[in-house]
UniProtKB/Swiss-Prot annotation:
This is Dual-specificity RNA methyltransferase RlmN. [4Fe-4S] cluster binds at residues 117, 121, 124. One of its GO terms (cellular component) is cytoplasm. Binds 1 [4Fe-4S] cluster. The cluster is coordinated with 3 cysteines and an exchangeable S-adenosyl-L-methionine. It comes from the Bacteria. One of its GO terms (biological process) is tRNA methylation. Disulfide bonds join 110-346. Its cofactor is [4Fe-4S] cluster. Residues 103-341 form the Radical SAM core domain. S-adenosyl-L-methionine binds at residues 171-172, 203, 225-227, 303. SMART domains: Elp3. The active site is at 97 (proton acceptor), 346 (s-methylcysteine intermediate). It comes from Marinomonas sp. (strain MWYL1). GO terms for molecular function: 4 iron, 4 sulfur cluster binding; metal ion binding; rRNA (adenine(2503)-C2-)-methyltransferase activity; rRNA binding; tRNA (adenine(37)-C2)-methyltransferase activity; tRNA binding.
Length: 371
């Protein structure tokens, strides 16, 4: 007799959880009870849910489960940054990385959306590793669940252990649209994690059609991985630009802002690489390019990884680039490198997985030819 596959309630959005409970003949309020137990109290079993009837708990035990991803390891940087390697349902060689960055009374969790990445940005370690598959909603929200639970029993009335979530880990979130949206809805729902829409940020390399779709589904904050002031250079650094060039991307960003219920800005992410995109002329070009968009700019000095071929710019060069943009009227921040001693900094996440694209092997072969 074949075992019945249990429904994992961890990844169900509130709407889908209500639908599920109604489908098994239960009242809507039961879904609210269960979602609070899972996401606010960290319950791992139905037996813990003391305000749920014994009969319903027994029923759920038969057909459901609460199963998060498995933590393979946790590393803590000298600056307090934490990195988890998390095993997904794909097996022992399908692991992603999740990073928690503390900063005073803030704690930002960087969440992965894919096992590997389906894009091939030239300066990103994840992209060099290739791609296996998309994460499920349970594997995405499970990263938040794991991070919060790592500090001990969850207390819905205590201080927030995670104040901000950024979809900036491994993978391109908009290439895994539905699971990412479901997970973000859970992050912001009052009965789950209750994060403000301004404190949940999705970062994309520019999957233009999905930006138009995203604003119809949710109103999270949006960040764009731009990294170049023109199409010629961006085509080299961010290959998806060949399909969706900068003008189309900025037009989609403008549409996103115009359709939000409140006034906000887009965050432009720009990784500075020495001798590649960090000269004064390029700073002026970027300032001119972004005049059409309400935005702030986050400069990210490149974080080296083996065989990347790029170098971090000098502090003087970074400050000069920042000043040119600030003088043009932009709010400009320079991201402080955090967690680089445990390979948890921006662009360094690689995980451990089977690469279906053979991209990682191709890069190894290419390096051997050049050496």
């Amino acid at each position: 007799m074949t075992d019945i596959k249990k429904v994992n309630l961890l990844g169900l959005s509130p709407e889908k959880l209500i639908e599920f409970f109604e489908s098994i003949g239960e009242k809507k309020f039961r879904a609210t009870q269960v979602i609070k137990w899972i996401h606010q109290k960290g319950a791992e079993s139905f037996e813990e849910m003391t305000d749920v009837s014994k009969a319903l708990r027994a029923k759920l035990e038969q057909i459901c489960e609460i199963r998060g991803p498995e933590v393979v390891s946790q590393n803590i940087s000298t600056d307090g940054t934490r990195k988890w390697i998390i095993r997904t349902e794909g097996g022992k060689n399908d692991c992603v990385e999740t990073v928690l960055i503390p900063d005073g009374d803030r704690a930002t969790l960087c969440v992965s959306s894919q096992v590997g990445c389906s894009l091939d940005c030239s300066f990103c370690s994840t992209g060099k590793q290739g791609f296996n598959r998309n994460l499920t909603p349970a594997e995405i929200i499970g990263q938040v669940w794991i991070a919060i639970k790592s500090f001990g029993p969850m207390d819905p009335n205590g201080p927030r252990r995670v104040t901000n979530v950024v979809m900036m880990g491994m993978g391109e979130p908009l290439m895994n649209f539905e699971p990412v949206v479901d997970a973000m809805i859970l992050m912001m729902h009052d009965h789950a994690y209750g994060l403000s829409k301004r404190r949940v940020t999705l970062s994309t390399s520019g999957v233009v059609p999905k930006i138009y779709e995203l604003v119809k589904r949710t109103d999270v904050s949006l960040a764009i991985s731009l990294h170049a002031p023109n199409d010629a250079l961006r085509n080299e650094l961010v290959p998806i630009n060949k399909k969706y060039p900068i003008a189309e991307l900025l037009e989609a960003c403008q549409f996103y802002l115009e359709n939000l219920p409140d006034k906000r800005h887009i965050t432009i992410e720009y990784t500075l690489m020495s001798g590649v995109n960090d000269n004064e002329e390029q700073a002026h070009e970027l300032a001119e390019l972004l005049k059409v968009l309400e935005c702030k700019i986050n400069l990210i000095p490149f974080n080296p990884f083996p065989h990347s071929g790029y170098e971090k710019p000098s502090n003087n060069r970074t400050r000069r680039f920042q000043k040119i943009l600030a003088d043009a009227g932009y709010t400009v921040t320079v991201r402080t490198t955090r967690g680089d001693d445990i390979d948890a900094a921006c662009g360094q996440l690689v995980g451990d997985f089977h690469d279906k694209t053979r991209r990682s092997q191709k890069y190894i072969e290419l390096r051997e030819v050049k050496s």
